[in-house]
C-alpha cells in the first residue's frame, strides 16, 4: 500500500531507530531519553518507541513548527528548538532528572548541551553527526575533545557507534518488522514523509536534508 515505507519506517531508518535504542540504549521505564533530529525518520521513531517503553522523551528539532509536531503528533513530552539562544537552559529545564539515554544524530552544540546533563551509566547510541559532515577542517575555538571524553569517563557513559546492517544479527530485522508493523497498524507509531517530485530535484532535496530543511523522511518520487 505504501511502497516508499520500505525506504523509511520499515527499512533502514526505522530499523536503525529500533536496534539503536533497544539494543544499545536499553531503555527502562521512567528514564529520560533525549533524541536529536526529532522530526527525522530515525529520531521520530526513536522517540515514539521510547514512549512505548515508558520513558520520558525530550526531542530536539529546528524551529517552532517542528517542535510542535513532535509534541502534539508524536507524543514526546517536550521538544527544544536548537536554534534558540538559550537551548542549553531549556534542555536542562526539560530534563530535571538528567539524561539516561541520548540518541545522537547531529553532534555540534546539541551534543555539548547534553553532556553536562548525562546521568551515571547513561547510554549514547551514535547514529550520525550531521552538524559536522560538511566541515572543511577542524573548528576554531576550544577543543571539546577533553570535555567529551572526561564526561564519558567520569559518568561511566556507554557511547557506541553503529552501522545498522553490520552491527546486529540478521535475525533482529524480523523482530523489528513484526513489532513495527503492529505499532503502525494500531497507531502507536506515526510516520511522516517529505515527498519531492522528480529526479532533477534530488540534489536540492539532499542539500535541504543536511541543513534541516526537510520535515520527515525525504523521498524522491520518479514517474
Where are these regions (language model features)?
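Terminal helix/beta-alpha structural elements that buttress the NAD(P)+-binding lobe
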Residues: 1-223
